[in-house]
């Protein structure tokens, strides 16, 4: 009985002994149908939160070119290295913000200068549009007669009549300046050829009008987009409602505004009306011009200036400092993200690795990749002593496996002194004059490993590892290059500001005479002065006539005389007042006559023929005039 029991139990004990000798994984699979208590249970889900307890060993997988791109096999950073990475990121972002802020400031200043220049030209053009020339005036007429005849078209600002102290009479012409350009335009249209004092007067634009003709054309073209009419000679007792009730019979009116007078309930006798369509505007002009309203004949014409054309330019508003810095930071961040995406795509689009004897060398675009030995040296100072020099950009070298040593010195190697890298980080030498941004973190001092745009989880790890490895190597050269980079930044900013100021200057003849050559533009300016001048097609005639001899037939006579030497394109008669005060009536006036031919040879023949000739008892002085200055509308030479 007892022997049979022992015999029956012995096979079971052998089975248990065999099961105990099996591995845990096999034991679990063999008893899959039973509930067993295994020491290592089956993992149904992958583990994401893993803690590193040992050192990272570099195996054959480190030879892959995608290792650096995908952020694999990266060492764990110490707290000190994390601080260095944070400082590098902060410094790089500050430099990027400074550069973007400087560019924004220069662009804003350039825009302000262009706006000011445009406003000045516009104001000068509008001032010329307010003036008309009145010639062939009878010597019996006085200034009061001229004022009464031209007042119905708009308020007159000033009347400048030439006066001869010898004969005690005026010289037969005058300049009438209105407060608004529409008054001068109506006077030009309706008073030219009118009979005054037994003579038909001549009304036209001043002779210096062509130099601003381009801006004037732009203003008039802009005014055509508005269906506005100008109404003058309005009775003082009529109000805006009265004028609107009369003119709204031609069509719907958008607004009706009379110019405010000296008091609250008075007006200056003119106003503007804007219709909803062009047809109503044309009908109002045709029907209401010279219409008797309240005992005064209305003067109605189309407006030649847009609304608020005479308004003073607003002061240039500057962006608040906080807003400018925030905008610069946002711009720098976007540029960094764009760099991450472009570098990642560039790295993946390159060829496959090429095997070489002794080492594996891989071309990875133009991005510097940190070697594994350098990354290991960041964690182990002992390994940093034997770390190789940084390779040129785009070269990746596989490390030699090193057995760990308890003493901190690799086995099989003699203790060596610290080796200084023979090549500085490529980013420090590639662009020394600009803040350097690397990858997607905006670091401007050291290169980083580019990552895929979609691999958000590996961005931070890859950038941090590359920064920590290269930060130690960059410390050697950063001290020497920091001063050079600072000087380069200052030099570039100075050049940009100087170029901006040079573009904003409007050089007249007087400024060109007092010009001094300095700075980097000296060579260019000297070469420009030594270049062969362009053949001029313009001659200037001085001392040909006096201000009293200028009339409506003078231009035709000069053009007919100069036609003997070639084809005359145009003749400009310019009255230059020898004072800066435009309202000074006693200032001396010099008449300059500019004649433009179709060819330079014709201008030379005209200059040689007319120079020294006598015209009306005066000795004419004929000279060639600079073509470039003439094309710019500068007649002050």
Curated annotation (Swiss-Prot):
Major location category of this protein: nucleus
GO BP terms, alphabetized: alternative mRNA splicing, via spliceosome; cystoblast division; mRNA splice site recognition; mRNA splicing, via spliceosome; negative regulation of cell population proliferation; negative regulation of growth; oogenesis; regulation of alternative mRNA splicing, via spliceosome
Tissue distribution: Expressed in all germline cells and within the follicle cell.
SUPFAM superfamilies: RNA-binding domain, RBD
GO molecular function terms noted in the UniProt entry: RNA binding
Stored SMART domains: RRM, RRM_1
Domain RRM, chain residue ranges per copy: 130-208, 227-305, 537-627
Keyword annotations of the record: Developmental protein, Differentiation, mRNA processing, mRNA splicing, Nucleus, Oogenesis, Phosphoprotein, Repeat, RNA-binding
Residues with Phosphoserine modification: 13, 30
Assembly and interaction partners: Interacts with enc. However, given the cytoplasmic localization of enc, the relevance of such interaction is unclear.
Main function: Splicing factor that regulates oogenesis and controls both mitosis and mRNA localization in the germline by regulating mRNA splicing of a subset of genes within the ovary. Probably acts by regulating the alternative splice site selection of the otu transcript. Also regulates the alternative splicing of eIF4E1 and grk, while it is not involved in the splicing of par-1, sqd or psq. Involved in the alternative splicing of the bicistronic pre-mRNA encoding Kdm3 and CG8176; required for the efficient production of mRNA encoding Kdm3 and Kdm3-mediated regulation of rhino-dependent piRNA production.
Domain remark text: The third RNA recognition motif, called PUMP domain in PubMed:10606266, is atypical and may rather mediate protein-protein interactions.
Name this protein carries in UniProt: Poly(U)-binding-splicing factor hfp
Species of origin: Drosophila melanogaster (Fruit fly)
